Amino acid sequence: KKGEFIIWLSDIHFDNGKGKHAFPAQDNDQQKCLSSRVVELADKYSNGNKCAGLAISGDLTWQSQVEGFELASKFIKDVSSSLSLTPDDIIICPGNHDVGLVSKEQYFEIMGKPTTDTPWATLAENYHKGSKENYIKFYKDVFQRKPEEDLSQGRKFLLGGHKVVEVAALNSCVLQQVKDSFLGMGFIGEKQLSNVAESMGWMNKSGEYISKKRGVTRIAMLHHHLTSINEAEDAYLDSKYSVTLDAERLLRWVVKHKVDYILHGHMHRSSCITIKKILSPLEPVSASNPEHTFQIISLGSSGVASSELPNQDCANYACIMDFSGEKLAFKFFKLDRQNGANETATYAIEGLS
Protein backbone atom coordinates (compact mmCIF):
# COMPACT_ATOMS: atom_id res chain seq x y z
CA LYS A 1 0.00 0.00 0.00
CA LYS A 2 1.13 3.53 -0.74
CA GLY A 3 -0.75 4.79 2.29
CA GLU A 4 0.92 5.14 5.67
CA PHE A 5 -2.00 5.36 8.10
CA ILE A 6 -4.62 2.94 9.40
CA ILE A 7 -7.94 3.99 10.93
CA TRP A 8 -8.76 2.26 14.21
CA LEU A 9 -12.33 2.17 15.57
CA SER A 10 -13.94 0.39 18.50
CA ASP A 11 -17.27 -0.12 20.30
CA ILE A 12 -19.43 1.23 17.50
CA HIS A 13 -22.57 -0.50 18.83
CA PHE A 14 -24.86 -0.56 15.81
CA ASP A 15 -28.36 -1.67 16.79
CA ASN A 16 -31.91 -2.20 15.56
CA GLY A 17 -32.91 1.40 16.23
CA LYS A 18 -33.76 0.74 19.87
CA GLY A 19 -30.25 0.48 21.30
CA LYS A 20 -27.32 2.74 22.01
CA HIS A 21 -25.80 3.79 18.66
CA ALA A 22 -25.21 7.56 18.65
CA PHE A 23 -25.29 8.32 14.92
CA PRO A 24 -28.17 8.31 12.41
CA ALA A 25 -28.44 5.37 10.01
CA GLN A 26 -27.92 7.76 7.09
CA ASP A 27 -27.06 11.41 6.51
CA ASN A 28 -29.78 14.02 6.94
CA ASP A 29 -29.92 17.82 6.90
CA GLN A 30 -28.69 18.16 10.49
CA GLN A 31 -26.55 15.11 11.17
CA LYS A 32 -24.07 12.79 9.48
CA CYS A 33 -23.88 9.02 9.87
CA LEU A 34 -20.73 7.40 11.24
CA SER A 35 -19.37 6.25 7.88
CA SER A 36 -19.56 9.81 6.54
CA ARG A 37 -17.66 11.15 9.56
CA VAL A 38 -14.95 8.46 9.31
CA VAL A 39 -14.44 9.04 5.58
CA GLU A 40 -14.40 12.80 6.17
CA LEU A 41 -11.69 12.36 8.83
CA ALA A 42 -9.60 10.17 6.52
CA ASP A 43 -9.88 12.68 3.68
CA LYS A 44 -8.91 15.59 5.95
CA TYR A 45 -5.97 13.72 7.40
CA SER A 46 -4.66 12.16 4.22
CA ASN A 47 -3.17 15.27 2.61
CA GLY A 48 -2.91 13.23 -0.56
CA ASN A 49 -1.78 10.13 1.33
CA LYS A 50 -4.01 7.06 0.97
CA CYS A 51 -5.59 5.27 3.94
CA ALA A 52 -4.03 1.81 4.10
CA GLY A 53 -6.46 -0.05 6.33
CA LEU A 54 -9.31 -0.22 8.83
CA ALA A 55 -9.12 -1.93 12.25
CA ILE A 56 -12.11 -2.46 14.57
CA SER A 57 -11.57 -3.83 18.08
CA GLY A 58 -14.99 -5.32 18.77
CA ASP A 59 -18.52 -4.46 19.85
CA LEU A 60 -19.75 -3.63 16.39
CA THR A 61 -23.29 -4.19 17.71
CA TRP A 62 -25.25 -3.36 20.85
CA GLN A 63 -26.90 -6.73 21.49
CA SER A 64 -25.74 -8.88 18.56
CA GLN A 65 -29.00 -8.28 16.68
CA VAL A 66 -29.17 -9.20 13.01
CA GLU A 67 -30.06 -5.59 12.21
CA GLY A 68 -26.96 -4.38 14.04
CA PHE A 69 -24.70 -6.66 12.05
CA GLU A 70 -26.40 -5.61 8.81
CA LEU A 71 -25.64 -1.97 9.63
CA ALA A 72 -22.07 -2.91 10.59
CA SER A 73 -21.60 -4.66 7.25
CA LYS A 74 -23.02 -1.68 5.37
CA PHE A 75 -20.77 0.67 7.35
CA ILE A 76 -17.62 -1.29 6.50
CA LYS A 77 -18.59 -1.53 2.84
CA ASP A 78 -19.38 2.20 2.62
CA VAL A 79 -16.07 3.18 4.23
CA SER A 80 -14.16 0.66 2.11
CA SER A 81 -15.74 1.94 -1.09
CA SER A 82 -15.01 5.58 -0.27
CA LEU A 83 -11.40 4.89 0.80
CA SER A 84 -10.65 2.23 -1.86
CA LEU A 85 -10.08 -0.51 0.72
CA THR A 86 -10.43 -4.22 0.00
CA PRO A 87 -11.37 -6.95 2.53
CA ASP A 88 -7.65 -7.70 2.84
CA ASP A 89 -7.16 -4.17 4.23
CA ILE A 90 -9.65 -4.72 7.06
CA ILE A 91 -9.12 -6.47 10.39
CA ILE A 92 -11.68 -6.97 13.16
CA CYS A 93 -12.20 -8.93 16.36
CA PRO A 94 -15.49 -9.66 18.16
CA GLY A 95 -16.59 -7.94 21.34
CA ASN A 96 -18.71 -9.31 24.16
CA HIS A 97 -21.78 -7.47 22.82
CA ASP A 98 -21.28 -9.22 19.46
CA VAL A 99 -21.47 -12.75 20.82
CA GLY A 100 -24.37 -12.75 23.22
CA LEU A 101 -23.92 -10.50 26.26
CA VAL A 102 -27.47 -10.29 27.60
CA SER A 103 -29.43 -9.97 30.85
CA LYS A 104 -32.87 -11.44 31.47
CA GLU A 105 -34.48 -8.03 31.07
CA GLN A 106 -32.68 -7.40 27.77
CA TYR A 107 -33.47 -10.91 26.55
CA PHE A 108 -37.20 -10.46 27.13
CA GLU A 109 -37.09 -7.03 25.49
CA ILE A 110 -35.40 -8.48 22.39
CA MET A 111 -37.01 -11.94 22.19
CA GLY A 112 -40.26 -11.47 24.08
CA LYS A 113 -41.51 -13.48 27.05
CA PRO A 114 -40.90 -17.24 26.62
CA THR A 115 -44.03 -19.37 26.20
CA THR A 116 -42.45 -22.40 27.89
CA ASP A 117 -40.75 -23.09 31.22
CA THR A 118 -37.32 -23.32 29.62
CA PRO A 119 -34.62 -22.52 32.23
CA TRP A 120 -32.91 -19.14 31.89
CA ALA A 121 -29.50 -20.81 31.47
CA THR A 122 -30.79 -22.67 28.40
CA LEU A 123 -32.34 -19.52 26.92
CA ALA A 124 -29.09 -17.63 27.46
CA GLU A 125 -27.00 -20.42 25.92
CA ASN A 126 -29.23 -20.53 22.85
CA TYR A 127 -29.04 -16.75 22.54
CA HIS A 128 -25.26 -16.94 22.73
CA LYS A 129 -25.15 -19.56 19.97
CA GLY A 130 -27.48 -17.49 17.80
CA SER A 131 -25.37 -14.39 18.38
CA LYS A 132 -22.21 -16.20 17.28
CA GLU A 133 -24.03 -17.38 14.15
CA ASN A 134 -25.03 -13.76 13.44
CA TYR A 135 -21.38 -12.70 13.79
CA ILE A 136 -20.20 -15.48 11.46
CA LYS A 137 -22.82 -14.49 8.87
CA PHE A 138 -21.66 -10.87 9.13
CA TYR A 139 -18.03 -11.94 8.76
CA LYS A 140 -18.81 -13.96 5.64
CA ASP A 141 -20.66 -11.00 4.14
CA VAL A 142 -17.72 -8.63 4.70
CA PHE A 143 -14.78 -10.93 3.93
CA GLN A 144 -16.39 -13.42 1.51
CA ARG A 145 -15.04 -16.36 3.50
CA LYS A 146 -15.68 -18.19 6.75
CA PRO A 147 -13.82 -16.97 9.85
CA GLU A 148 -11.35 -19.11 11.74
CA GLU A 149 -13.02 -21.44 14.21
CA ASP A 150 -11.80 -19.32 17.14
CA LEU A 151 -12.82 -16.07 15.32
CA SER A 152 -9.24 -14.76 15.32
CA GLN A 153 -7.79 -12.96 12.30
CA GLY A 154 -4.43 -11.75 11.03
CA ARG A 155 -3.14 -9.19 8.56
CA LYS A 156 0.25 -8.10 7.27
CA PHE A 157 0.48 -4.60 5.81
CA LEU A 158 3.31 -3.19 3.69
CA LEU A 159 2.95 0.55 4.19
CA GLY A 160 4.61 3.17 2.05
CA GLY A 161 6.22 0.35 0.14
CA HIS A 162 8.69 -0.52 2.89
CA LYS A 163 7.16 -0.59 6.41
CA VAL A 164 5.90 -4.00 7.52
CA VAL A 165 3.05 -3.98 10.06
CA GLU A 166 1.74 -7.30 11.41
CA VAL A 167 -1.64 -7.23 13.17
CA ALA A 168 -3.08 -10.20 15.08
CA ALA A 169 -6.75 -9.85 16.06
CA LEU A 170 -7.65 -12.06 19.02
CA ASN A 171 -11.06 -13.25 20.16
CA SER A 172 -11.22 -12.40 23.87
CA CYS A 173 -14.85 -13.59 24.09
CA VAL A 174 -14.28 -17.34 24.18
CA LEU A 175 -16.38 -17.67 27.35
CA GLN A 176 -20.14 -17.46 27.04
CA GLN A 177 -21.14 -13.86 27.82
CA VAL A 178 -24.14 -14.18 30.13
CA LYS A 179 -25.19 -11.82 32.92
CA ASP A 180 -24.22 -13.20 36.37
CA SER A 181 -21.97 -15.75 34.62
CA PHE A 182 -18.77 -14.36 33.07
CA LEU A 183 -20.49 -11.01 32.47
CA GLY A 184 -18.11 -8.98 30.32
CA MET A 185 -15.15 -11.16 31.25
CA GLY A 186 -12.46 -11.74 28.66
CA PHE A 187 -10.73 -15.04 27.96
CA ILE A 188 -8.46 -15.94 25.05
CA GLY A 189 -7.03 -19.38 25.76
CA GLU A 190 -3.66 -20.99 25.15
CA LYS A 191 -4.79 -22.83 22.02
CA GLN A 192 -5.85 -19.63 20.27
CA LEU A 193 -2.57 -17.87 21.11
CA SER A 194 -0.55 -20.78 19.72
CA ASN A 195 -2.65 -20.96 16.56
CA VAL A 196 -2.37 -17.22 15.95
CA ALA A 197 1.41 -17.14 16.53
CA GLU A 198 1.88 -19.99 14.07
CA SER A 199 -0.48 -18.47 11.48
CA MET A 200 1.28 -15.10 11.73
CA GLY A 201 4.69 -16.73 11.20
CA TRP A 202 5.85 -15.84 14.71
CA MET A 203 6.29 -19.49 15.70
CA ASN A 204 6.83 -22.70 13.75
CA LYS A 205 4.85 -25.93 14.12
CA SER A 206 7.42 -27.25 16.59
CA GLY A 207 6.72 -24.34 18.94
CA GLU A 208 10.03 -22.57 18.26
CA TYR A 209 9.92 -18.78 18.10
CA ILE A 210 10.77 -17.15 14.78
CA SER A 211 12.88 -14.01 15.21
CA LYS A 212 11.18 -10.74 14.37
CA LYS A 213 12.90 -8.97 11.50
CA ARG A 214 14.33 -5.52 12.03
CA GLY A 215 11.89 -2.69 11.37
CA VAL A 216 8.75 -4.84 11.66
CA THR A 217 5.92 -3.51 13.87
CA ARG A 218 3.80 -6.12 15.63
CA ILE A 219 0.32 -5.31 16.97
CA ALA A 220 -2.12 -7.47 18.92
CA MET A 221 -5.74 -6.32 18.94
CA LEU A 222 -8.50 -7.62 21.20
CA HIS A 223 -11.67 -6.28 22.74
CA HIS A 224 -11.18 -6.59 26.51
CA HIS A 225 -8.81 -4.54 28.62
CA LEU A 226 -5.79 -6.11 30.33
CA THR A 227 -5.03 -3.47 32.94
CA SER A 228 -7.25 -1.20 35.04
CA ILE A 229 -8.94 1.50 32.98
CA ASN A 230 -11.39 3.00 35.49
CA GLU A 231 -9.96 4.65 38.59
CA ALA A 232 -12.41 2.70 40.76
CA GLU A 233 -15.28 0.26 40.30
CA ASP A 234 -18.54 0.47 42.24
CA ALA A 235 -18.94 -2.50 44.57
CA TYR A 236 -22.14 -4.51 44.23
CA LEU A 237 -23.05 -7.71 46.05
CA ASP A 238 -22.64 -10.77 43.78
CA SER A 239 -21.65 -8.59 40.83
CA LYS A 240 -19.20 -9.98 38.26
CA TYR A 241 -16.52 -7.49 37.29
CA SER A 242 -15.01 -7.04 33.87
CA VAL A 243 -11.53 -8.56 33.66
CA THR A 244 -9.50 -10.65 31.23
CA LEU A 245 -9.07 -13.94 33.04
CA ASP A 246 -5.86 -14.94 31.26
CA ALA A 247 -4.31 -11.46 30.95
CA GLU A 248 -0.93 -12.61 32.29
CA ARG A 249 -0.75 -15.40 29.72
CA LEU A 250 -1.36 -12.87 26.94
CA LEU A 251 1.25 -10.47 28.32
CA ARG A 252 3.83 -13.26 28.42
CA TRP A 253 2.87 -14.15 24.84
CA VAL A 254 3.47 -10.51 23.90
CA VAL A 255 6.96 -10.62 25.43
CA LYS A 256 7.85 -13.92 23.76
CA HIS A 257 6.82 -12.70 20.32
CA LYS A 258 8.02 -9.11 20.78
CA VAL A 259 4.65 -7.52 20.11
CA ASP A 260 5.01 -3.74 20.22
CA TYR A 261 1.42 -2.61 20.84
CA ILE A 262 -1.79 -4.04 22.28
CA LEU A 263 -4.98 -2.29 21.13
CA HIS A 264 -8.35 -2.73 22.83
CA GLY A 265 -11.71 -1.13 23.50
CA HIS A 266 -14.48 -2.39 25.85
CA MET A 267 -14.59 0.27 28.58
CA HIS A 268 -15.44 3.26 26.32
CA ARG A 269 -12.45 5.13 27.74
CA SER A 270 -9.22 6.15 25.99
CA SER A 271 -5.94 5.42 27.75
CA CYS A 272 -2.31 4.41 27.28
CA ILE A 273 0.22 2.58 29.43
CA THR A 274 3.82 1.57 28.71
CA ILE A 275 5.01 -1.69 30.25
CA LYS A 276 8.48 -3.19 30.58
CA LYS A 277 8.14 -6.89 31.33
CA ILE A 278 10.44 -9.87 31.90
CA LEU A 279 9.23 -13.44 31.49
CA SER A 280 10.70 -14.49 34.86
CA PRO A 281 10.91 -11.22 36.83
CA LEU A 282 13.00 -12.65 39.70
CA GLU A 283 15.70 -14.00 37.40
CA PRO A 284 18.40 -12.10 35.46
CA VAL A 285 17.63 -10.93 31.94
CA SER A 286 19.06 -13.33 29.36
CA ALA A 287 18.36 -14.69 25.90
CA SER A 288 15.98 -17.21 27.43
CA ASN A 289 14.50 -14.64 29.82
CA PRO A 290 14.11 -11.51 27.68
CA GLU A 291 12.97 -8.08 28.73
CA HIS A 292 10.50 -6.38 26.43
CA THR A 293 8.81 -2.96 26.35
CA PHE A 294 5.37 -2.50 24.82
CA GLN A 295 2.37 -0.18 24.98
CA ILE A 296 -1.27 -0.97 25.75
CA ILE A 297 -3.62 1.55 24.15
CA SER A 298 -7.38 1.83 24.61
CA LEU A 299 -9.50 3.74 22.12
CA GLY A 300 -12.78 4.17 23.93
CA SER A 301 -15.94 4.15 21.79
CA SER A 302 -16.41 5.30 18.22
CA GLY A 303 -20.19 5.19 18.14
CA VAL A 304 -22.03 4.52 21.40
CA ALA A 305 -24.60 6.94 22.83
CA SER A 306 -23.47 9.54 25.37
CA SER A 307 -25.33 7.73 28.17
CA GLU A 308 -22.76 4.91 27.87
CA LEU A 309 -19.68 7.17 27.86
CA PRO A 310 -17.57 8.22 30.88
CA ASN A 311 -18.47 11.58 32.41
CA GLN A 312 -14.82 12.67 32.36
CA ASP A 313 -14.56 12.39 28.57
CA CYS A 314 -18.01 12.09 27.04
CA ALA A 315 -17.05 11.79 23.37
CA ASN A 316 -16.72 9.30 20.54
CA TYR A 317 -13.28 8.79 19.02
CA ALA A 318 -11.51 7.42 15.97
CA CYS A 319 -7.76 6.85 16.08
CA ILE A 320 -5.41 7.46 13.18
CA MET A 321 -2.36 5.19 13.45
CA ASP A 322 0.22 7.16 11.48
CA PHE A 323 3.30 5.23 10.36
CA SER A 324 4.82 8.03 8.26
CA GLY A 325 7.36 9.20 10.87
CA GLU A 326 10.25 7.54 12.66
CA LYS A 327 7.86 6.55 15.44
CA LEU A 328 4.29 5.34 15.13
CA ALA A 329 1.85 8.06 16.22
CA PHE A 330 -1.62 7.39 17.62
CA LYS A 331 -3.89 10.40 17.04
CA PHE A 332 -7.34 10.45 18.63
CA PHE A 333 -9.98 12.54 16.84
CA LYS A 334 -13.45 13.25 18.17
CA LEU A 335 -16.39 12.09 16.06
CA ASP A 336 -19.61 14.07 16.20
CA ARG A 337 -22.83 13.53 14.27
CA GLN A 338 -23.51 17.28 14.09
CA ASN A 339 -20.03 18.70 13.54
CA GLY A 340 -17.19 17.72 11.24
CA ALA A 341 -13.86 16.34 12.40
CA ASN A 342 -11.35 18.75 13.89
CA GLU A 343 -8.10 19.40 12.07
CA THR A 344 -6.16 18.76 15.29
CA ALA A 345 -6.24 15.54 17.30
CA THR A 346 -7.64 15.70 20.84
CA TYR A 347 -4.94 13.31 22.04
CA ALA A 348 -1.66 12.26 20.46
CA ILE A 349 0.44 9.35 21.72
CA GLU A 350 4.00 8.81 20.58
CA GLY A 351 4.82 5.19 19.96
CA LEU A 352 7.97 3.28 20.79
CA SER A 353 11.26 4.02 19.08
Residue ranges and their predicted role:
Residues 43-50, 160-169, 178-281:
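His/acidic metal-ligating clusters that form di-metal
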